[in-house]
Amino acid sequence: MEMKKRLMLELRNRKAADVKELVLDNCRSDDGKIIGLTSEFENLEFLSMINVNLLSVANLPKLPKLKKLELSDNRISGGLEVLAERTPNLTHLNLSGNKIKEINTLEPLKKLPHLMSLDLFNCEVTMLNNYRESVFELLPQLTFLDGFDADDQEAPDSDPEAEDLEENGEDGEDDEEDEEEFEDELDDEEDDEEGEDEEGEEEEEGDEEDEDDEDVPQGEKRKRDLEDDGDEEDDDDEEDDE
């Protein structure tokens, strides 16, 4: 499903300003860019765009209340200064499975004073010598890197903010049902359009037949009608004989 269509699904009967949690996982971005998401989502606190083939976050709008951003399994290699400019209150950032190769790529994140948790699993940068020490030194505001703090203590399984968002959000099953209903509606609209086209074609064919009859001389037309009546009478006689 395209990202714009998925946004339409998520917005059904709601205004963008009323949305606090938005999940766009596994939909298709537009040439590796975010599309359809606007600054009207001003109260958004949780945004997930996992596996949407993103190359860049350049089109991310200003989201002043965003706290948690999931961007794992994309192809982002840089441009993180956008996050510092447009998500100033970010606390959790997941960039796992992206194309982050160098520590200095993370430098723009220094401007996110509330950033507590950063995930970089399956990024090449994690293979560098002294990776963890370097990241904690670069980003002193961090508490957890890849699920562990600087003393190798594991992060809690869940954080209260995320739980609150999940409780306030719709259940996964409801989302799936809504998505199926939405797709069915789109299919019905397409079928209606096709049906209208077919009806139009049938009407045109009927009009052409009427025109053909009008073109036939009156004598010929009367002759045809008489022949048709004669055929019907013959059929009736055969039935009586039986």
Curated annotation (Swiss-Prot):
Keywords: Chaperone, Leucine-rich repeat, Nucleus, Repeat. Belongs to the ANP32 family. This is Acidic leucine-rich nuclear phosphoprotein 32 family member B. Histone binding is mediated by the concave surface of the LRR region. Residues 148-217, 227-242 have a biased composition (Acidic residues). Transmembrane segments: none annotated. Residues 123-165 form the LRRCT domain. Residues 148-242 are annotated as: Disordered. It is found in: Nucleus. LRR repeats lie at residues 18-38, 43-64, 65-87, 89-110. Multifunctional protein working as a cell cycle progression factor as well as a cell survival factor. Required for the progression from the G1 to the S phase. Anti-apoptotic protein which functions as a caspase-3 inhibitor. Has no phosphatase 2A (PP2A) inhibitor activity. Exhibits histone chaperone properties, stimulating core histones to assemble into a nucleosome. SMART domains: LRRcap. GO terms for cellular component: nucleus. Its main location: nucleus. The keyword Chaperone applies. InterPro entries: AN32, Leu-rich_rpt, LRR_dom_sf, U2A'_phosphoprotein32A_C. Pfam families: LRR_9.
